[in-house]
């Protein structure tokens, strides 16, 4: 029997079967996809083959994971060589960002975007809590939106509290399985409650001491839109503190920064790393202001990930 994983509680997986029934399943101990060292062998969005519970008390279990169309993956933790898969078989991803309380850095944004580019997952940036922004915050919001829209990433300015911008965001999610990700405290749960009122997710507060969010979502789950096309759903994920990249070779990192990759076609050397080489068209474009300095800094930070000891958790 086949189905789709719609919830991961850590010890069990809720699978929606092709006949519409939902079953909690265990994962076989040797269940791993070839070539992936993951802390979670099964991810929400995975298409799986399951064996139902037997009459002799054997619980239902996941026998096989079907090949993934794509996924979003990150380094599991500091100095770790293992990965954590946030979601699989995605049509899109929404990265929820905030200018303040907590701050979403451009390095964090760009690491997420580069990973999504690597696995061909289109990303929408949703800047939340705009009802709380000061004039200075608004200026920063406009600066960031200008950078990312110029590259080709849609930017939505939204408020889960007032509802501003939500219709535009929701229209981009119609007919899609969309991963929702971001730091703890950026308002992911509040945003889902505003987009899908029946979701009724628990929301949390910001730590005033550290200006960071406190986890309210502890497991990943798929939530259907009742008022959009069939197949429209969000995957809610726990807050991410840092985003370490994986599986990116030194000479391919630039491929996942569209504006850097476009400029690199003019480089003198085919193996240019865009850091110091003579005749580097990327460095020239950077000097002319055609590439944002923040994006280039993020590019350099991913190059450093080859040395795991230099991974910095604030990303």
From Swiss-Prot:
Its EC number is 3.6.1.-. Binds 1 zinc ion per subunit. Gene3D superfamilies: Nucleic acid-binding proteins, P-loop containing nucleotide triphosphate hydrolases, Probable gtpase engc, domain 3. Residues 79-243 form the CP-type G domain. SUPFAM superfamilies: Nucleic acid-binding proteins, P-loop containing nucleoside triphosphate hydrolases. One of its GO terms (biological process) is ribosomal small subunit biogenesis. It is found in: Cytoplasm. PROSITE patterns: ENGC_GTPASE, G_CP. GTP binds at residues 128-131, 182-190. Zn(2+) binds at residues 267, 272, 274, 280. Signal peptide: none annotated. Monomer. Associates with 30S ribosomal subunit, binds 16S rRNA. One of several proteins that assist in the late maturation steps of the functional core of the 30S ribosomal subunit. Helps release RbfA from mature subunits. May play a role in the assembly of ribosomal proteins into the subunit. Circularly permuted GTPase that catalyzes slow GTP hydrolysis, GTPase activity is stimulated by the 30S ribosomal subunit. Belongs to the TRAFAC class YlqF/YawG GTPase family. RsgA subfamily. This is Small ribosomal subunit biogenesis GTPase RsgA. It comes from Porphyromonas gingivalis (strain ATCC 33277 / DSM 20709 / CIP 103683 / JCM 12257 / NCTC 11834 / 2561). The gene is rsgA.
């Amino acid at each position: 029997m086949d189905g789709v994983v719609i919830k991961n509680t850590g010890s069990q997986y809720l699978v929606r079967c092709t006949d519409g029934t939902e079953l909690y399943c265990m994962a076989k101990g040797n269940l791993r996809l070839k070539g992936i060292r993951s802390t979670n062998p099964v991810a929400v969005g995975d298409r799986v083959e399951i064996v139902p519970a037997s009459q002799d008390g054997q619980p239902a279990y996941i026998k096989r994971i079907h090949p993934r169309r794509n996924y979003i993956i990150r380094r599991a933790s500091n100095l770790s060589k293992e990965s954590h898969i946030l979601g699989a078989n995605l049509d899109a991803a929404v990265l929820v960002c905030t200018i303040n309380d907590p701050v979403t850095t451009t390095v964090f944004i760009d690491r997420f975007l580069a990973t999504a580019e690597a696995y061909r997952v289109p990303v929408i940036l949703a800047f939340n809590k705009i009802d709380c922004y000061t004039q200075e915050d608004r200026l920063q919001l406009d600066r960031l939106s200008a950078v990312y829209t110029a590259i080709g990433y849609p930017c939505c300015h939204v408020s889960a509290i007032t509802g501003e911008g939500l219709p535009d965001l929701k229209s981009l999610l119609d007919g899609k399985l969309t991963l929702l990700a971001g730091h703890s405290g950026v308002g992911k749960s509040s945003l889902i409650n505003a987009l899908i009122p029946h979701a009724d997710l628990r929301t949390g507060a910001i730590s005033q001491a550290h200006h960071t969010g406190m986890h309210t979502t502890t497991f990943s789950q798929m939530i259907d839109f009742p008022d959009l096309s069939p197949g429209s759903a969000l995957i809610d994920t726990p807050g991410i503190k840092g985003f370490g990249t994986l599986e990116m070779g030194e000479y391919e990192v630039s491929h996942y920064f569209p504006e850097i990759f476009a400029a690199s076609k003019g480089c003198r050397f085919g193996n240019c790393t865009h850091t110091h080489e003579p005749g580097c068209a990327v460095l020239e474009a950077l000097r002319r202001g055609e590439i944002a300095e923040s994006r280039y800094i993020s590019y350099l930070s991913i190059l450093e990930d080859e040395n795991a000891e230099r991974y910095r958790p604030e990303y």
